[in-house]
């Protein structure tokens, strides 16, 4: 097991390194650069390039970048925020996005599980149908449409929640965006939980448990959920990454200074900000790889078939 | 509630079950009667889909949710630990009541496929102990000791160590032994074995059958075997119920069924059994396939596949004709007015051989 973990961590780091390199080269060869040519003369641009080290060979630039990165230094923006250190800007954005995304994950998973379990336990009855319809709507309606709907009813018609994100009333003003972001996760988790549970409830081992007299909540908890939840972890992982890395449109509509908004600014601002694009790309990838790693390890904890090797004595 | 027979422990009376499916209603069980006496072994034999498993699942409250019991009774003589005795109709009990009072404690089941019938996320020790801890006042240590004992009883070596194994670490035969240990953990009166050896290879099959037989005599269990394997039936059963399309078409003790079968379907089943001495180079199989019970045919459901079918078979379902006190068969051939029909010669020769062989062992 220890060996397996080390191997997985090593592979993850290697993957990340490759991603950073590809990103690094890609931003430089793709169209667009950090300098708005209509406002800068050729000379100014050349000076700026030299200042940023962009005139050096790509591999040298990469080496410089990596040495700084390994010290935890993302560098400065090439055009955005007048060259403020990326770390500081990123910190605020990450904290905003993570808190709103985290709340969305909590709501989505908890309510989704609850809906899925309710549907599975009432298979074929009204509640099951209701949950199915709900999940289809939840998967189909984009979160920002739902956000606008919520804003209309709960900020305008009944003024309970603020119209826009307010960093000073953090918890209160993150409710609307979190709820609208959670809808997709909620529906996906609900649908998946329901289907997995129904399958497990039809399995031979649940029949055997019943035939030895297990029933009710013990049967559901110990035999049905325990087995149904294992595959749910897999669908949950990418959903978590999606939510943590911010939602472009929702952040824009609700005026949240999050990662999503930062990404849009980095690409579609005054010019393409190489360092921001890179920093955000690394963040996305690291999160994704990290969560996948956690899921793989969690699988081992949840599923003895992976943890304990076959016939192992 | 009264039982017909005072020695009986389980009596199924006129059980009738329909399944609701998207395609329509399937009349899967059509008036089944079955008797089980204490200490006896009864087999239910039939092709896939004849309703063998459904009958026993209904009797233990494990029927799939789309199954509807139209009528019938499953009477069980429930003996409690304090010696009190009561005849209960299992079909009248709620699921919860069944699980609490009956499943595991009185009626336990062994399923067909040991590869899928154990919970993959639970060690086998806790799986055996689970029922005990729920039902009895045994402490965890006592339940554990009892579980180890049971594992030894079903012939698992290194029982103490195996308690911590997960199902995937055991072979098919071992898993089936664990399933049997689980079934025995509640000290049941009746053990229902639903094709317990179908998924196992032949050498293991024989061992598992021996094990069940051995435990049966030691613990005084009554056993119901659900199987399509007449070889298994011949080895273990006292009484045999031959089931076809949701009806029991012939019932008798094992000698009557094997040496004096009366129903053409039983003839077919016996002829289809592989046999070393048969001179034919082809193995007989019953022509056609079981009827689709979505569209219940009028008359005898077996008639279209029956070479000996009479005209009346197309119009009316035959009643059970009595041949002896223990032997009944539902075929119009037994009607006094029916033409006398000789057994197919190959089968006749075969039954003769079987009888002689049996005599040699007596």
Put a short name on every predicted segment.
Chain A
Residues 11, 19, 107-108, 135-138, ...:
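Transmembrane alpha-helical core residues of multi-pass small-molecule transporters
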Residues 2-3, 94-127, 143, 168-313:
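Alpha-helical transmembrane segments of integral membrane proteins
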Residues 50-57, 73-83, 167-170, 265-275:
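Membrane-interfacial helix-loop-helix junctions in multi-pass membrane proteins
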Residues 16-63, 158-176:
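Hydrophobic alpha-helical transmembrane segments of membrane transport/permease proteins
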Residues 47-50, 64, 68, 88, ...:
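Short amphipathic alpha-helical coupling elements at transmembrane boundaries
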Residues 55-113:
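An internal, D/E-rich "acidic patch" concept
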Residues 23-29, 65-67, 133-162, 180-184:
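Membrane-water interface segments at the C-terminal ends of transmembrane alpha-helices
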Residues 6-16:
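N-terminal signal-anchor/signal peptide hydrophobic helix marking the start
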């Amino acid at each position: 097991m220890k060996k397996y973990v080390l191997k997985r961590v090593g592979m993850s780091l290697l993957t990340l390194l490759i991603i950073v390199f590809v990103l690094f080269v890609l931003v430089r060869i793709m169209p667009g650069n950090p300098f708005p040519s209509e406002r800068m003369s050729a000379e100014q641009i050349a000076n700026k390039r030299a200042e940023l080290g962009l005139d050096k060979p790509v591999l040298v630039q990469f080496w410089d970048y990596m040495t700084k990165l390994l010290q935890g230094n993302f560098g400065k923006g090439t055009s955005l925020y007048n060259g403020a250190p990326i770390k500081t800007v990123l910190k605020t954005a990450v904290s905003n996005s993570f808190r709103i995304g985290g709340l969305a994950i909590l709501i989505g998973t908890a309510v989704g599980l609850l809906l899925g379990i309710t549907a599975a336990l009432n298979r074929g009855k009204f509640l099951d149908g209701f949950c199915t319809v709900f999940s289809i709507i939840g998967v189909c309606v984009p979160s920002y449409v739902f956000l606008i709907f919520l804003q209309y009813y709960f900020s305008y018609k009944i003024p309970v929640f603020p119209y826009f994100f307010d960093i000073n009333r953090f918890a209160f003003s993150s409710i609307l965006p979190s709820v609208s972001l959670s809808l997709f996760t909620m529906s996906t988790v609900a649908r998946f939980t329901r289907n997995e549970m129904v399958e497990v409830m039809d399995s031979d081992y649940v029949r055997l448990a019943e035939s030895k007299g297990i029933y009710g909540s013990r049967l559901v908890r110990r035999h049905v959920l325990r087995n149904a939840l294992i595959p749910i972890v897999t669908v949950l992982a990418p959903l978590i990454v999606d939510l943590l890395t911010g939602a472009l449109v929702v952040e824009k509509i609700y005026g949240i200074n999050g990662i999503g908004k930062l990404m849009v600014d980095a690409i579609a601002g005054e010019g393409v900000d190489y360092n921001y694009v890179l920093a955000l790309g690394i963040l996305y990838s690291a999160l994704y790889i990290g969560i996948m790693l956690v899921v793989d390890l969690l699988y081992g904890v949840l599923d003895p078939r992976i943890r304990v090797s076959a016939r192992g004595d | 509630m009264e039982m017909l027979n005072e020695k009986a422990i389980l009596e199924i009376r006129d059980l009738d079950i329909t399944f609701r499916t998207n395609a329509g209603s399937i009349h899967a069980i059509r008036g089944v009667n079955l008797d089980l006496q204490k200490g006896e072994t009864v087999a239910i034999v039939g092709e896939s889909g004849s309703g063998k498993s459904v009958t026993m699942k209904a009797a233990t409250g494990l029927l799939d949710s789309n199954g509807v019991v139209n009528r019938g009774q499953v009477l069980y003589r429930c003996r409690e630990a304090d010696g009190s005795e009561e005849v209960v109709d299992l079909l009248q009990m709620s699921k919860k009541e069944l699980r609490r009072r009956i499943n595991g404690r009185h009626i336990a089941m062994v399923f067909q496929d040991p590869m899928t019938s154990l919970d993959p996320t639970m060690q086998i020790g806790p799986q055996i102990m689970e029922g005990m801890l729920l039902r009895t006042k045994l402490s965890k240590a006592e339940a554990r000791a009892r579980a180890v004992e049971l594992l030894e009883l079903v012939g698992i070596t290194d029982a103490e160590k195996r308690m911590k194994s997960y199902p995937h670490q055991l072979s098919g035969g071992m898993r089936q032994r664990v399933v049997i240990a689980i079934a025995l953990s509640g000290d049941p009166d009746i053990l229902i074995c639903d094709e317990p050896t179908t998924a196992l290879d032949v050498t293991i099959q024989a061992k598992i059958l021996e094990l069940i037989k051995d435990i049966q005599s030691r613990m005084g269990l009554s056993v119901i075997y659900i199987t399509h394997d007449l070889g298994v039936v011949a080895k273990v059963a006292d009484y045999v119920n031959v089931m076809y399309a949701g009806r029991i078409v012939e019932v008798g003790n094992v000698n009557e069924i094997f040496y004096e079968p009366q129903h053409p379907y039983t003839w077919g089943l016996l002829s289809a059994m592989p046999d070393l001495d048969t001179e034919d180079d082809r193995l007989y199989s019953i022509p056609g396939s079981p009827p689709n019970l979505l569209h219940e045919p009028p008359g005898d459901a077996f008639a279209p596949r029956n070479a000996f079918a009479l005209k009346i078979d197309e119009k009316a379902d035959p009643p059970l004709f009595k041949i002896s006190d223990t032997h009944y068969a539902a075929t119009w051939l037994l009607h006094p007015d029916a033409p006398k029909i000789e057994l197919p010669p190959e089968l006749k020769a075969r039954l003769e051989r079987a009888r002689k062989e049996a005599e040699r062992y007596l």
